[in-house]
Amino acid sequence: MIDHSSARDAVTRLTRWADDFPQPGVRFADLTPVFSDADGFRVVVDALAACAPEADVIAAVDARGFLLGGGVARELGSGVVAVRKSGKLPPPVLSQSYTLEYGTATLEIPAGSIGLDGRSVLVVDDVLATGGTLDATARLVESAGARVIGVAVVLEIAALGGRERLGKYPLTSLVTV
């Protein structure tokens, strides 16, 4: 088992909590202070990278996952693919839609030009809530021929059930609330 205590301490110390944001009854975890603290960011990136040192590619989820994914890819010497929200990439794209609480959303990656076929991918994002975005990301990169070897997040909100939704994939969360 990998010791994530330094990262866990940094996340616990630096995360800013905002009540009733973006709507009443929601408690939002703002990880921006973690990213802006050089030592905090470094230990978080190191801990996420340790989850799958054999990863060929990091799939970084739009938008805060981009910050983490680039750092993890740099640490591992692997590539990084930005998994974008719909409409941000020119065609052709591969897409995966998923259900939100009130509607649907779609994620996209370039079709054919990023060479994911047969490659080992670690999916990285900041927060695991319901698991919809991360599940869609994993299915999207699998549709490109990649093998998802794990999902790694900084913070997991356990009460929202995302871990169960991602049960097929090895999951690492640095902090669970």
UniProtKB/Swiss-Prot annotation:
Under the heading InterPro entries, the entry gives: Ade_phspho_trans, PRibTrfase_dom, PRTase-like, UPRTase/APRTase
* A Gene Ontology biological process term: AMP salvage
Q: Tell me which family the UniProt entry assigns to this protein.
A: Belongs to the purine/pyrimidine phosphoribosyltransferase family.
Gene3D superfamilies per record: 3.40.50.2020
Assembly and interaction partners? Homodimer.
What Pfam family is a match, any one?
A: Pribosyltran
Key word Nucleotide-binding present = no
The metabolic or biological pathway listed in the UniProt record of this protein is: Purine metabolism; AMP biosynthesis via salvage pathway; AMP from adenine: step 1/1
* GO CC terms: cytoplasm
Instruction: Give the reaction(s) catalysed.
Output: AMP + diphosphate = 5-phospho-alpha-D-ribose 1-diphosphate + adenine
Q: Which GO terms describe its molecular function?
A: adenine binding; adenine phosphoribosyltransferase activity; AMP binding
Question: Could you identify this protein by its name?
Answer: Adenine phosphoribosyltransferase
* EC nos: 2.4.2.7
Q: Which HAMAP family match?
A: Aden_phosphoribosyltr
Function, as annotated, reads: Catalyzes a salvage reaction resulting in the formation of AMP, that is energically less costly than de novo synthesis.
Subcellular locations according to the entry:
Cytoplasm
- What SUPFAM superfamilies does the record point to? PRTase-like
Instruction: Give the record's keywords alphabetically.
Output: Cytoplasm, Glycosyltransferase, Purine salvage, Transferase
Source organism of this protein record:
Rhodococcus jostii (strain RHA1)
Q: What is its main location?
A: cytoplasm
